[in-house]
Curated annotation (Swiss-Prot):
The keyword tRNA-binding does not apply. Heterodimer of AddA and RexB. One of its GO terms (molecular function) is double-stranded DNA binding. It comes from Streptococcus pyogenes serotype M12 (strain MGAS2096). Belongs to the helicase family. AddB/RexB type 2 subfamily. This is ATP-dependent helicase/deoxyribonuclease subunit B.
Length: 1071
């Protein structure tokens, strides 16, 4: 064995490549070993350093891959074990154990996290060269007993299913020990680069290779100053020193110092020496030189987005200077925090990148499909799960519009559960859903699912066969192919599909002869899919590499950007959270030789020093270290390592916000510039100098010209809520000439409530989601229907019998049966409605002098100027003197207020009077009024009554009165009925004023509607609060910010309120 060390200013790779070349020139086969995370980059670096740029004699690889070169022909043809397969094996083992067999872990048998921890422990035991029987000295002896039972049973299953329990390194070591590879190894030289420690498995293999190979060469970075130190605790080279010293002591050799021809910039060397002096308690009498600072930058940004944008701009600048993407490396302090943001921002700046991390499959549509399938079976056809399965795009041949229509109907009809999905859809609404089409779609969904879900407990092989048959019926494979929109997505889908088929194969192999329920089968497949990962190789090598900062090696790239280096992430503090504590691992390590657990927490300090040292020397030309003030919406402090650099004299540059400028880094990329123009266009104007204004005016003019060529436009500024008028073409379609504009009292109320609400409801015809469950609208229909039947019954039957018959026949109507007999809640609502009917009906019995002329009367009122008002009058009554009036049933309290009417918010009764005046017979000229009848079950506070007598009855009937507009001429005839005429009597002239002003309201609204410009103007009565519909989710209206846009109602003092409003109406209606 040969141990080599060198200073950070030299290239260890060049030194080891020269050693490898010498061995290759002598005819030896050379394996150049690099860590798993660096083998790809190391291979490119090694080949670059070779004069011939390639050779068959030197193979750059990893330990695991090297073992396959030697054992590929002799290794037994057994099944491969991966993490998903291991999890399934442990699940099967736990199935065979009873809870009482596992005193410590019996309650966790079906816990997926516990199974994952078992998998991790098993892998750790293999890497540590330990067996489960070596787990002595645990905090609780029962833990070891339980683990022995579980792992031994799992290993028995592995043997039965012909799985290879040995790792590739174990198989390699066994072959070496048996002397099967002596001839090959005698002609082999092993070169090892980039390691600062070995696992127990690698350590054991290295001892065998050292005895059988021609030579083993290991290199590491250690300064001569540190190598000569006797006390190395806390030294930045502590990890490498321990590594070399342990090897030197074990193999009885002395490490040698070497140098390379390539010497890196002195600035990095001087920074390293200052860093080393800080941690070895020595002093230096010099500081960084001024030109050294050109190679380092310390940035501070407010948050992650700004930080990434600054990096992207700097990368674009480097490209402008002639460098390539492959010359740049981006390191992340927190991979999870930055992974989701860095992609879209780099795409915006058109920077191709490769993220050196396996992607989880959890977000892929195939995983969402499997999860929805499992949940549909487990939760008995829950609607959300069925719809999620359809929306994955992998179930059947349904368009998005078909799925939307199916979803809308199932929400309306409240379809959930197998019983409702299995029955034909028969319920319809005013929207007239296409039931024939929906039922065909229902069958296409239900039949294959029903065939799969009815599977009973059976062999796993049979369940897999049925699952595959189901997937074929729904055309899963074909739909998977149709998902991809780009070559990259095709490659990702291929990797996901491969993992899916591997999981199905493993399940078939492990559970093929085990009896399982379908729910367990789907749950296992779902768990395997959600925990699986895949990796896609970039299509080109000229990309910016992105990876975690703790995987970096010295002298990786010319330009390195390390971001997210906050106190919480730099240095990293790693702790185990598995089935064994670090203390238990340490006790096990004390009694083992060549076999030991890796305890990350015990090596945090020296590993972090090693990582910081590698990071500070990662670049060969320029290193940028950046820290955000806020990361993951949490404030964080500077890293202690960055504070050391500040003490060395490196300035901390506050990058601030990404203000627009005309530097190359800001305007050098068209796509990024366009996005910034859009961003500033959405904000309030910022202060600019005259020169800045002139520059951006020219740029904006140029961009608009380019956008017009592409038929695009910049969005308008929305710092104030504003709306655009409809185009002439749209106005002609919505309000064609020659066809009267149709309005109603409800539509007019909506218009004066908020014009934009009218636009949404009556121009765009947007409606709220319907539901079969009874709401206020359906309750009103029921009450109307009962009273309509009651008032049509002119038989001599007692009133109470008539009422019972009306309720009975209404309840028997198919629509109300479907609505009110669907569940207990609906039946309770029906009981309350029946009580309301019984409570309100007596008012009809009292007014015997009333004759009902008509009910549910449709009308069409011509207002002139091509305006047609339509509606339905609930009831038309006639008094004994022949005068007519209208009654409108209400399920909530209503009464006519002249101020509300004046402001356009209560035109219903006056509109009905106008309609009645038009449709009344010619011999009837007098109208006695228009009124509301509140259908209610009066509630009385008995505490206020001293005794139960006639006063109580009078109070009930006092609540059951007609309230509205009444003619003063008919006062005598109204006095004997249940009419609340106080402050509600109007003379014929006043009634005519109301009718004229009502017409004015319609004409005024119609004129505005036909212009096609609808304002966002909910009304306010006091100028402080907004009572109108604000539609916040659509308009983003905020009362405190947009009060100026609200329509202020006209309000008058209560004294002489009626006369003042009538005066205003006469003035406005005669303009």
């Amino acid at each position: 064995m040969k141990l080599i060390y060198t200073e950070m200013s030299y290239s260890m790779t060049e030194i080891l490549v020269n050693e490898a070349r010498k061995a290759a020139d002598q005819g030896y086969r050379v394996f150049y070993i690099a860590p798993n995370s660096l083998s790809f980059e190391k291979e490119r670096e090694v080949l670059t350093l070779l004069p011939e740029r390639g050779t068959f004699s030197i193979i750059v690889t990893r330990f695991v891959q090297m073992s396959r070169y030697f054992t590929v022909e002799s290794s037994p043809s057994k099944q491969h074990l991966d993490d998903t397969t291991l999890a399934m094996i442990f699940y099967r083992a736990l199935m065979q154990l009873k809870p009482e067999d596992l005193p410590s872990y019996g309650r966790l048998q079906n816990n997926s996290v516990f199974i994952e921890q078992l998998v991790e422990l098993y892998k750790e035991l293999k890497n540590a060269q330990l067996s489960v029987h070596d787990l002595t000295g645990l905090d609780h002896p029962q833990k070891q007993e339980d683990l022995i039972k579980i792992i031994e049973l799992a290993e028995t299953i592995m043997i039965q299913q012909d799985y290879n329990q040995d790792s590739p390194l174990q198989s390699f070591a066994r072959a070496i020990k048996l002397g099967l590879l002596n001839n090959q190894l005698s002609k082999t030289v092993i070169v090892i680069d980039g390691f600062s420690r070995f696992s127990a498995e690698e350590d054991y293999l290295l001892s065998l290779l050292n005895n059988n190979c021609q030579e083993v060469i290991i290199g590491s970075y250690v300064s001569q100053k540190a190598y000569q130190k006797s006390f190395i605790k806390g030294n930045i080279y502590e990890a490498s020193l321990h590594f070399l010293q342990d090897l030197a002591q074990k193999y009885h050799i002395k490490p040698v110092f070497a140098t390379s021809n390539q010497v890196f910039k002195p600035a990095f060397s001087r920074l390293t020496q200052l860093f080393e002096a800080t941690h070895d308690f020595s002093q230096v009498d010099w500081q960084l030189q001024k030109n050294d600072l050109d190679h380092f930058s310390l940035w501070q940004c407010h948050h992650q987005k700004e930080e990434i944008e600054h990096v992207a701009k700097s990368i674009r600048q480097k490209l402008y200077e002639g460098y390539r993407y492959k010359d740049i490396l981006v390191l992340l302090g927190d991979m999870d925090a930055y992974q989701l943001q860095i992609g879209p921002i780099f795409d915006k700046f058109e920077i191709p990148y490769y993220l050196g991390k396996a992607e989880p499959m959890a977000a892929h549509p195939l995983v969402q499909f499997i999860e929805s399938l499992e949940r549909s079976q487990r939760y008995n056809w829950r609607r959300e799960d069925i719809l999620n399965m359809l929306k994955s795009g992998l179930f059947g041949c349904f368009d998005d519009s078909d799925i939307d229509r199916f979803e809308e109907y199932t929400q309306f009809a409240d379809i959930k559960g197998f019983t409702k999905f299995s029955k034909p859809f028969t319920i319809n609404s005013s929207r007239q859903y296409p039931l024939d089409f929906l039922n065909e779609m229902r069958q296409d969904i239900v039949l294959p699912l029903q065939e799969l879900f009815k599977s009973q407990k059976q062999l796993g092989a049979s369940l897999i066969d049925k699952l595959i048959l189901f997937l074929e019926k729904i055309r899963l494979a074909e739909n998977m192919q149709g998902l991809a929109q780009s070559q990259l997505e095709v490659e990702k889908n291929e990797e996901v599909w491969k993992r899916f088929t591997d999981i199905l194969t493993s399940f078939h192999h492990i559970f093929g002869q085990e009896k399982l329920r379908l729910s367990d089968c789907l749950a296992l497949i779902k768990t395997g899919m959600k925990s699986a990962q895949y990796r896609v190789v970039p299509a080109t090598l000229d990309v910016v590499t992105i990876k975690s900062y703790d995987l970096v090696q010295p002298h990786s790239k010319p330009f390195v950007y390390a971001i997210g280096l906050t106190q919480s992430h730099f240095p990293k503090q790693i702790h185990h959270s598995g089935l064994l504590s670090d203390q238990e691992r340490a006790r096990i390590n004390e009694i083992r030789n060549y076999r030991h657990f890796d305890i990350a927490s015990a090596e945090n300090s020296k590993k972090n020093h090693q990582t910081a040292l590698s990071l500070f020397n990662a670049a060969t030309k320029e290193l940028v270290l950046s820290v955000p003030t806020v990361i993951n919406e949490t404030f964080d402090d500077l890293s202690p390592y960055l504070k050391e650099l500040i003490n060395f004299g490196l300035p901390l540059l506050d990058k601030g916000k990404n203000y627009l400028s005309y530097d190359n880094s800001d305007i050098g990329n068209y796509k990024a510039l366009l996005s910034q123009i859009i961003a500033i266009n959405r904000q309030d104007l910022i202060e600019m100098s005259d020169q800045d204004k002139m520059f951006w005016t020219v740029v904006l003019r140029y961009l608009r010209k380019q956008l017009r060529k592409q038929q695009l436009e910049l969005p308008t500024s929305d710092y104030r809520l504003s709306t655009k008028p409809l185009s002439k073409e749209v106005i002609e379609v919505c309000f064609p000439k020659g066809i009267p504009l149709k309005l109603s009292a409800t539509a007019l109320t909506v218009f004066y409530n908020n014009q934009y609400n009218y636009f949404l409801k009556y121009v765009l015809n947007l409606n709220k989601t319907e539901s079969i469950h009874p709401d206020s609208r359906i309750h009103g229909q029921y009450l109307h229907r009962v009273f309509e039947r009651l008032m049509k019954d002119h038989t001599q039957e007692p009133f109470d019998n008539k009422l019972k018959q009306a309720i009975y026949h209404t309840n028997q109507e198919s629509f109300f049966q479907q609505v009110y007999q669907d569940n207990a809640e609906a039946e309770y609502s029906l009981a309350i409605l029946e009580d309301i009917v019984r409570s309100t009906a007596p008012i009809l019995q009292l007014n015997q002098n009333i004759k009902v002329i008509d009910q549910e009367k449709n009308f069409h009122l011509d207002m002139g100027n091509e305006i047609l008002v339509h509606g339905i009058i609930d009831r038309i009554d006639q008094l004994s003197d022949g005068s007519l009036g209208i009654v409108d049933y209400k399920s909530s309290a209503n009464q006519f207020d002249i101020g509300t009417f004046y402001n356009g918010l209560s035109p219903q009764l006056v509109t009905y009077l106008a309609a009645l005046k038009q449709i009344a017979p010619h011999d009837i000229n007098q109208l006695f009024g228009a009124m509301y009848l509140h259908l209610q079950d009066p509630k009385l506070d008995l505490v206020t009554f001293k005794q139960i007598d006639n006063t109580l009855v009078e109070s009930i009937y006092k609540a059951l009165t007609y309230k509205g507009i009444f003619s003063e001429v008919e006062k005598e005839h109204l006095s004997t009925g249940a009419y609340q005429t106080k402050n509600a009597l109007y003379s014929n002239d006043e009634l005519e004023t109301l009718l004229n002003y009502n017409k004015y309201l319609y004409l005024k609204a119609a004129k505005h509607i036909k212009k096609g410009h609808f304002l966002i103007n909910p009304y306010t009565s006091d100028g402080k609060t907004v009572q109108g519909d604000q539609l916040k989710a659509i308009t983003r209206f905020e009362a405190d910010l947009d009060m100026a846009q609200a329509r202020r109602l006209v309000t008058l003092p209560a004294k002489e309120k009626k006369e003042c409003f009538l005066t205003l109406m006469r003035k406005e209606s005669h303009l």
